[in-house]
Curated annotation (Swiss-Prot):
This is Corticosteroid-binding globulin. The keyword Mitochondrion does not apply. Major transport protein for glucocorticoids and progestins in the blood of almost all vertebrate species. The gene is Serpina6. Belongs to the serpin family.
């Protein structure tokens, strides 16, 4: 999870998480900073995208980083013109009569800087975007400058006529950027491709209260009525925030990474996964956050490395963001040469979920004296995983874990 410096002070509004106020002298986080205007739109887009992806992959694991996808598509809009640009920004949830394009890009720039500032030795994260374009295209200097200024992104020439070679180039680029954490992102590419957008993120955080590795045991995970797999099940016991939801058929716990990371583990009742996912929204997260109880809990969570790799073209089309893939797309802000359309939007997110905390600096969980018998939360069947950066309430990750293996 994204981590804040120890000098941070945070005030969480009880009326609206998405206008959360914070103050940090190093990150200049204040109620009027640009990224705050993006938060509601980013979260709404996140849940819409997540539901479309889950619906397209029934019975499968799903794992995405919505905020990094939003950032990648907003970056692409710098080179879009006319209806292509309007459709793209509106598809991301932005009302262009209330938020100017300059404010959108400045907001993402500030958000990116915030993520970088919040990172330190307790966090391992690699996040970025890149455009790969036909090597014969001459790119506009203004586009290259803007993508660098706002998004720290690169536009690279590729020989798509050599599909295998272009794939190797992209995979090697991502491998180097993630120090080998993400490999083999794309396979052989179509020789007719001219523009590919690549977005990637790897994350490994540090628990505020770590799990004890000696307590991890091999246990059953019930994928469905006929499939059971063995998984390393982590365990911790102590005071934990939890909720038995009376509105939706689920229960959940909230854990914290050191710094700014808030993690929701959501366990739907058997057969109710679709009902819970359909109800995910800003209002639902708001209600959960306000309704959590702190109590004695025995918590069991699988140790996993979860990842998701997707070409988002079809999903974005279903969401009404289709013009950028059409031969009539207007990317004249990228090049003034031959008409250009987007061939692929490739996204990969990887999360390492293990026992580790900051061993020397982290206090163990406290068992309250005279407390009642601990409640048990055992995530041994499909569950929903959500990770937010609670400075910006950006949706870093949304996942559906069907099979941890």
């Amino acid at each position: 999870m994204l981590l804040a410096l120890c000098t941070c002070f945070l005030w969480l509004s009880t009326t609206d998480l998405w206008t959360v106020q914070a103050k940090d002298p190093d990150t200049d986080v204040s109620p009027r900073t640009p990224h705050r205007d993006l938060a509601p739109n980013n979260v709404d887009f996140a849940f819409i995208l997540y539901r479309h992806l889950v619906a397209s992959l029934p019975g499968k694991n799903v794992f995405i980083s919505p905020v990094s996808i939003s950032m990648a598509l907003a970056m692409l809009s710098l080179g879009a013109r006319g209806y292509t640009r309007v459709q793209l920004l509106q598809g991301l949830g932005f009302n262009l009569t209330k938020l100017s394009e300059a404010e959108i890009h400045q907001g993402f720039r500030h958000l990116r800087h915030l993520f970088e500032k919040e990172s330190d030795t307790m966090l391992e994260m690699a996040m970025g975007n890149a455009l790969f374009l036909d090597r014969n295209l001459e790119l506009l200097e203004s586009f290259l400058a803007d993508t660098k200024h706002y998004y720290e992104a690169e536009a690279l020439a590729a020989d798509f006529k050599d599909g295998a070679g272009a794939s190797r180039q992209i995979n090697e680029y991502i491998k180097n950027k993630t120090q080998g954490k993400i490999v083999d992102l794309v396979s052989k590419l179509d020789s007719s491709a001219m523009l590919i957008l690549v977005n990637y993120i790897f994350f490994k955080g540090t628990w505020e209260h770590p799990f004890d590795p000696e307590s991890t045991r091999q246990e059953n995970f019930y994928v469905n009525k006929t499939t059971v797999v063995r998984v390393p099940m982590m365990f911790q016991s102590g005071t934990i925030k939890y909720l038995h939801d009376r509105v939706l058929p689920c229960q959940l716990v909230q854990l914290e990474y050191l710094g700014n990371g808030t993690v929701f583990f959501v366990l739907p009742e058997e057969g109710k996964m679709d009902t819970v996912i359909a109800a995910l929204s800003r209002d639902t997260i708001q209600r959960w956050s306000e309704s959590l109880t702190t109590g004695q809990v025995n918590l069991y969570v699988p140790r996993v490395v979860i990842s998701g790799a997707y070409d988002l073209r079809a999903i974005l089309g279903d969401m009404g963001i289709a013009d950028l893939f059409d031969k009539e797309a207007d990317f004249s802000g990228i090049t003034r040469e031959a008409p250009l359309k987007l061939s692929k939007v490739v996204h990969k997110a990887v999360l390492q979920l293990d026992e580790k905390g900051l061993e020397a600096a982290t206090c163990p969980r406290v068992m309250l004296e005279g407390a009642s018998e601990p409640l048990t939360f055992r995530f041994d069947r499909p569950f929903v995983l959500m990770i937010f950066d609670h400075f910006s309430w950006s949706s870093l990750f949304l996942g559906k874990v069907v099979n941890p293996n």
